[in-house]
């Protein structure tokens, strides 16, 4: 699963890295966690950008997942990362992990999903992501390939939740 952080504020004098979620972001992020529970797509591992808005998004998602939530790890390299870096982080996932959630930033989240999505992907989900990847958007992909072997069009995009 690949998720974009929820909507972030831009307070005067705050660095981009330290931007907090807006009230809307604080409402939308937990909805994604609830959707995961309702649809049985709870991650075994979560990797989040270390920026404040992604950490806050991750906290809300984990709060909704409750005791099913794994301990999230923060990855500095996901902040403003190009697509290849996001894919590299995914590729380093231990093979014992079967379900991963990455929480990162636009446009890398959109580009990574479109890079990974095969022609067998859900048409509407693919079209939705092609049109944009809004804050708190979530793409759910599946694959039989090992994480380290993912190099493009290797996964089936099953769902795209755009808030």
Regions found by a protein language model. Name each.
Residues 2-78, 118-122, 133-136:
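Active-site-proximal alpha-helix that buttresses catalytic centers in soluble enzyme cores
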Residues 54-55, 83, 109-110:
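Short, well-ordered alpha-helical microsegments
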Residues 78-95:
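Short phosphate-binding loop-to-helix
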Residues 117-156, 160-162:
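Domain-level recognition of soluble alpha/beta enzyme cores
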């Amino acid at each position: 699963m690949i998720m974009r952080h929820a909507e972030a504020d831009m307070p005067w004098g705050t660095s981009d890295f330290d931007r907090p979620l807006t009230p809307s972001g604080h409402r939308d992020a937990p909805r994604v966690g609830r959707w995961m529970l309702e649809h049985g797509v709870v991650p075994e591992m979560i990797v989040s950008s270390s920026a404040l808005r992604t950490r806050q998004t991750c906290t809300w998602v984990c709060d909704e997942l409750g005791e099913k939530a794994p301990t999230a790890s923060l990855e500095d390299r996901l902040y403003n990362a190009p697509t290849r870096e996001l894919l590299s982080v995914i590729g380093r996932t231990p093979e014992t992990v079967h379900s991963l959630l990455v929480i990162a930033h636009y446009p890398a989240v959109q580009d990574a999903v479109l890079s990974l999505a095969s022609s067998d992907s859900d048409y509407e989900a693919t079209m939705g992501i092609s049109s944009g990847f809004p804050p708190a958007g979530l793409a759910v992909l599946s694959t039989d390939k090992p994480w380290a072997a993912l190099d493009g069009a290797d996964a089936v995009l099953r769902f795209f939740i755009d808030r």
